Amino acid sequence: MNTMENVFTNATQYKTKKLLTFISSLLIILGVVLSFTVWFFAKPVISKSIDIPDGFSVQGVSLNQTSSYIDFDNLANNNINFIYMRTTYGDSSMDSGYKSSLSRAKSAHLKVGTIHVYDASVTAAAQSQYYIDNVGNSIGELPIAISVTSDQISTATSKQRLASLVQTLISHYDHDVIIYTTPAIQKKLSSTIKNTKYWLIEDNTKDTSSKNLFIQYDEDHTIGTGLKAIKMPTTVFNGTQKQFEVYK
């Protein structure tokens, strides 16, 4: 009987020891998993400053009405010096969030420029007045940009209307105006608009002609890393840091 009891006791002790070992191992594994989970979600987001293309010292981004909420401080921390915001279209559409975005961009110490989208079906007077009425003096520091697509300059009249819009805004604000467009459209406008500089839409930074004040080199560039990474059209200023600082 004693022998049977000893066998039973030893078996029980073995099972108990095995169970305790299993539980201990399980607790250790759970502890490791829990520690990793806490570290993963609590660790700071690391932002990596994006490089500026060789030969340039200033770069920025552009946003429009379809852009989601933008963390301007994150942009500033990633070698972004300026931002262009789409404000008006023709004489019928205004980005209602522009002035709020302008305020936040200034708080992040970014220089700001506005984008007006040209509509050839509307007179230059109507478009300029719509811009003046809605944007007012909140035009930022950078030249006013007029976005032009190929379908809006198909006639001589549409080109002349654009030229008139440029001059009207320059006269009203005593402020530079540039045309935001592609090399092909720039060529088509060369005989009509001769003294206005351009913001060229490209996929590289090769055309550093003095007529190109800005060059958009990537329309979907990744800025930052991790949870704060964002893709935006990215542009370089075709000049020196000192020349850029003139815009105040």
Name every feature range the model reports, one short phrase each.
Residues 46-48, 53-68, 87-164, 171-172:
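Substrate-binding cleft of extracellular glycoside hydrolase catalytic domains
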